[in-house]
């Protein structure tokens, strides 16, 4: 059977749905606090959570928006979000299974869009951003949050390698400049950007994804062989825990 990228993503995340709903890294953080402020100021009527994962952005937006649509490629992830929303009494969250690059929605059907820790899995980065622009009303706000590459090849190669070994559905963590350029090409005008450093506890990070012992050892081997510069940038600890760079870009749909 042919294993497409979409099937690889669904296989990778379907069995891990509960782990992402329960994940502390995904359920809290400075980025969610910043996003909450933007959502409150926007007071959306219909908001889209693009690549919902464990649904934490949807649960946040449901407190302010009249309606929220949570989209994810994984049917199991969507089912977990629907169950959690029901358990929390959030009746204004609808779930839809679809790829970011081919959204089953009308043009301009949403007045707010948020996308958190999803774009690095997309087969077509620009295609997903173009779809986000298409389904969002002109002049409305979109917020994109993701791990980003620090840029220099020395750091970028290490980052992409450990990400891919841990999660074989990983495509790419983009640089800040790649994000800004892709948003501009896709119809967005960036209006603000914030960055954070996020610590990844190695045992939790690998367990959440169900990374095999063989692959976890491979990551530790890469870390042990890393240059002093790489070790310093990612603040690699003795147990393999390390720091990631995270960005949040607020943009207007042109």
Predicted regions and their residues:
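Conserved class I S-adenosyl-L-methionine
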Residues: 1-43, 56-60, 77-80, 143-165, 204-206
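Class I SAM-dependent methyltransferase SAM/SAH-binding core
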Residues: 48-50, 54-102
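Conserved Class I S-adenosyl-L-methionine
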Residues: 54, 190-254
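A conserved beta-strand element that flanks and buttresses the S-adenosyl-L-methionine
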Residues: 114
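Short catalytic micro-motifs in class I SAM-dependent methyltransferases
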Residues: 117-118
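A short glycine-rich, Lys/Arg-flanked "PGG" loop and its adjoining helix->strand segment in the class I
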Residues: 126-138
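Short alpha-helix
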Residues: 172-186
């Amino acid at each position: 059977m042919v294993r497409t990228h979409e099937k690889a993503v669904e296989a990778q995340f379907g069995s891990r749905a509960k782990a992402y709903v329960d994940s502390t890294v995904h359920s809290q953080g400075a980025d969610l606090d910043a996003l909450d402020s933007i959502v409150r100021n926007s007071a959306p009527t219909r908001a889209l959570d693009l690549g919902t994962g464990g649904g934490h952005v949807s649960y946040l937006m449901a407190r302010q928006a009249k309606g929220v649509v949570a989209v994810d490629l994984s049917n199991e992830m969507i089912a977990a979000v629907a169950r959690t929303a029901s358990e929390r009494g959030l009746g204004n969250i609808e779930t839809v299974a679809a790829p970011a690059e081919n959204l089953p929605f009308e043009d301009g059907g949403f007045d707010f869009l948020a996308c958190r820790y999803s774009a690095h899995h997309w087969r077509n980065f620009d295609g997903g951003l173009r779809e986000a622009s298409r389904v969002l009303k002109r002049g409305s706000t979109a917020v994109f949050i993701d791990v980003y590459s620090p840029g220099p090849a020395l750091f970028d190669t290490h980052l992409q390698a450990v990400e891919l070994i841990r999660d074989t559905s990983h495509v790419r963590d983009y640089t800040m400049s790649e994000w800004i350029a892709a948003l501009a090409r896709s119809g967005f005008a960036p209006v603000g950007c914030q960055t954070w450093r996020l610590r990844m506890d190695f045992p939790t990070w690998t367990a959440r994804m169900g990374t095999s012992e063989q692959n976890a050892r491979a990551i530790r081997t890469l870390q042990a062989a890393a240059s002093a510069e790489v070790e310093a940038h990612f603040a690699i600890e003795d147990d393999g825990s390390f720091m990631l760079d995270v960005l949040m870009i607020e943009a207007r749909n042109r």
